[in-house]
């Protein structure tokens, strides 16, 4: 079973990297876009699909090739608010199954930014490494300056028992 998950994960990562739309087996909402016939149309993996549907329908996002709050998205996929990404991570973690863990690893390895309103970032205080990539987990901020919209790194997905909520 582990080899099967690895093959699915690698295929999904390659598809995402090349902009191909594939949907996680058993879901209609988990993948670039969706194949659902409507909001109430869910796949056989209902709980996982509900997490993805909620994430897809989050209104706090910067669509590809657009700007919001002075932030530009030059990527092929939307950049979601940090609040939306946090809800998605918590939803996946709450399922405690192999499918949600695999999706979390794939998604949070290929998507690396979110946006929020906060004090200006001065530097990164704590980093997280995953193979050859690093992300900032906590920032030193300049509280003396006005708040602004800015990008933040998304933490890599780890086993739910070690997730911070």
Task: Report residues per predicted region.
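Extended terminal accessory/targeting regions
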Residues: 2-165
